[in-house]
């Protein structure tokens, strides 16, 4: 695990991978091009891969990124620990925050998905010292996560961002057309999937997104 400084700046342009969308260009090639374009953190997410396949991908991606930006994994905290990744992101229905932190250790990144003010308040009350950031959303409807909750919209995002004590990352349906509006709500960063993974030129896509900040 690399000792990345856990600054909110690392959340500025947060790439969540989608193996299917990256298939033509290659997952690793897409990620490296996106980092060249300004991506500041990468989350490996593949809901369909086996744990063995995901571990292999995690190790290959970690070697390719070579510490340039933090690499975290979605949900699979044990794989993050085993592959010595920089951390993990978990949802409301996954492993508890306390369990995840115990597995990952103090130095790792740990983020949690938040969809409502009640969830945020509960997080402040119970997990404030265990988390590094919260993911707020979905902001807009998105095709890359079929089971997502009701979109919170820009107004909901603004409310949650202002209420959060922790650094915030907005996620869900964010692209070049709305990135500036999302950044203007006060969140520390935006998380994107298809806006980069489905782009013909991931480097240029990342450059265009970070320019909206």
Curated annotation (Swiss-Prot):
Superkingdom of source: Bacteria
Cofactor(s), names only, from the UniProt record: Mg(2+)
Catalytic activity: 2-[(2R,5Z)-2-carboxy-4-methylthiazol-5(2H)-ylidene]ethyl phosphate + 4-amino-2-methyl-5-(diphosphooxymethyl)pyrimidine + 2 H(+) = thiamine phosphate + CO2 + diphosphate; 2-(2-carboxy-4-methylthiazol-5-yl)ethyl phosphate + 4-amino-2-methyl-5-(diphosphooxymethyl)pyrimidine + 2 H(+) = thiamine phosphate + CO2 + diphosphate; 4-methyl-5-(2-phosphooxyethyl)-thiazole + 4-amino-2-methyl-5-(diphosphooxymethyl)pyrimidine + H(+) = thiamine phosphate + diphosphate
Annotated keywords: Magnesium, Metal-binding, Thiamine biosynthesis, Transferase
Alphabetized InterPro entries for the sequence: Aldolase_TIM, ThiamineP_synth_sf, ThiamineP_synth_TenI, TMP_synthase
SUPFAM superfamilies linked to this entry: Thiamin phosphate synthase
Entry binding sites for 2-[(2R,5Z)-2-carboxy-4-methylthiazol-5(2H)-ylidene]ethyl phosphate: 142-144, 173, 193-194
Any one Gene Ontology BP term: thiamine biosynthetic process
Reported function: Condenses 4-methyl-5-(beta-hydroxyethyl)thiazole monophosphate (THZ-P) and 2-methyl-4-amino-5-hydroxymethyl pyrimidine pyrophosphate (HMP-PP) to form thiamine monophosphate (TMP).
CDD domains listed in its UniProt record: TMP_TenI
One of the record's GO cellular component terms: cytoplasm
Sequence positions that bind Mg(2+): 75, 94
PANTHER family per UniProt: THIAMINE BIOSYNTHETIC BIFUNCTIONAL ENZYME, THIAMINE-PHOSPHATE PYROPHOSPHORYLASE
Cofactor detail note: Binds 1 Mg(2+) ion per subunit.
Uppermost EC category: transferase
HAMAP family for this protein: TMP_synthase
Family classification: Belongs to the thiamine-phosphate synthase family.
Gene Ontology terms for molecular function: magnesium ion binding; thiamine-phosphate diphosphorylase activity
Pathway(s) this gene product operates in, as recorded in its UniProt entry: Cofactor biosynthesis; thiamine diphosphate biosynthesis; thiamine phosphate from 4-amino-2-methyl-5-diphosphomethylpyrimidine and 4-methyl-5-(2-phosphoethyl)-thiazole: step 1/1
Full protein name: Thiamine-phosphate synthase
Binding site for 4-amino-2-methyl-5-(diphosphooxymethyl)pyrimidine: 43-47, 74, 113, 145
Enzyme Commission number(s) of this protein: 2.5.1.3
Pfam families: TMP-TENI
């Amino acid at each position: 695990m690399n000792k990345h400084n856990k600054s909110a700046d690392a959340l500025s342009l947060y790439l969540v991978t989608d193996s299917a969308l990256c298939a033509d260009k290659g997952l690793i090639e897409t990620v490296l091009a996106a980092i060249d374009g300004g991506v500041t953190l990468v989350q490996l997410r593949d809901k369909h891969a086996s744990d063995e396949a995901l571990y292999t991908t995690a190790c290959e991606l970690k070697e390719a990124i070579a510490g340039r930006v933090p690499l975290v994994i979605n949900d699979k905290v044990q794989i993050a620990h085993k592959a010595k990744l920089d951390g993990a992101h978990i949802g409301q229905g996954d492993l508890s925050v306390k369990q995840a932190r115990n597995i990952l250790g103090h130095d790792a990144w740990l983020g949690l998905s938040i969809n409502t003010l009640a969830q945020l308040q509960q997080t402040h009350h119970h997990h404030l010292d265990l988390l590094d950031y919260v993911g707020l959303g979905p902001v807009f409807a998105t095709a890359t996560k079929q089971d997502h909750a009701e979109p919170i919209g820009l107004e909901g995002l603004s409310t949650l961002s202002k209420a959060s004590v922790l650094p915030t990352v907005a996620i869900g349906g964010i692209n070049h057309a709305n990135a500036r509006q999302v950044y203007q709500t006060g969140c520390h960063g935006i998380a994107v999937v298809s806006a980069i993974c489905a782009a013909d030129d991931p480097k240029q896509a990342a450059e265009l997104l970070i320019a909206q900040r």
